[in-house]
Amino acid sequence: MFSIQQPLLVFSDLDGTLLDSHSYDWQPAAPWLSRLREGNVPVILCSSKTSAEMLYLQKTLGLQGLPLIAENGAVIQLAEQWQDIDGFPRIISGISHGEISQVLNTLREKEHFKFTTFDDVDDATIAEWTGLSRSQAALTQLHEASVTLIWRDSDERMAQFTARLNELGLQFMQGARFWHVLDASAGKDQAANWIIATYQQLSGKRPTTLGLGDGPNDAPLLEVMDYAVIVKGLNREGVHLHDEDPTRVWRTQREGPEGWREGLDHFFSAR
């Protein structure tokens, strides 16, 4: 479909896509990450994780200095060379983590919804839930514009909770393992479009875009990509796009980083 020589941006989800859902291993994707880095193709990480978590992962993956999308699009970490852009080093969309937490605490106290947020527990508990080390688990609590939670109520109550959040200008989003509350104005798609427009403004040409994801919260991102890889995932709802033209969308047979590699193999060889 395209070559590594043309202007190209790769947007990638993390857990269940570039990273294995259980072990967080990414080695099957390492050859492609090296090839893209050598070809000066930016790989822009896009996740529900905090910017602190993602900056650590960026360095681990050899992607430091590039922009990234954190907290499902509520936070954009700017590229190191974008220091002249207003808001550097991060752009926050919507209300803050603290304000969202206040709303959730009020709903829990007054309307008796049952859930546990990451703010309710310590890093040892999060490490147990996620399989992360204590130091990495501590980074998951550094939210700036969203709240991560475990839902502990019925599906009927979830529908009521979602409606109440919508009334208050918030959205309730499902990730690979947890649920996330963020401002209704934020999203991976809006954040990706902003980054694409910034690259276009700086280079004078709109880059071709390829997105990879495995969960329902990746659908908005994949909808705005020129090409999309839907990595086989664990979520029972999966990913469904409005336009699933097979020349544009590839569903992998493999999961996690093996699927990530499969998707890159497909689009770079299908010329």
UniProtKB/Swiss-Prot annotation:
Cysteines engaged in disulfide bonds, as pairs: none
Record-linked InterPro entries: HAD-like_sf, HAD-SF-IIB-MPGP, HAD-SF_hydro_IIB, HAD_sf, MPG_Pase
GO biological process terms on file: mannosylglycerate biosynthetic process
Superkingdom, natural source: Bacteria
Gene Ontology molecular function: magnesium ion binding; mannosyl-3-phosphoglycerate phosphatase activity
A GO CC term assigned to this protein in UniProt: cytosol
Active site feature: D13 (nucleophile)
EC numbers for this chain: 3.1.3.70
SUPFAM superfamilies according to UniProt: HAD-like (SSF56784)
Protein name: Mannosyl-3-phosphoglycerate phosphatase
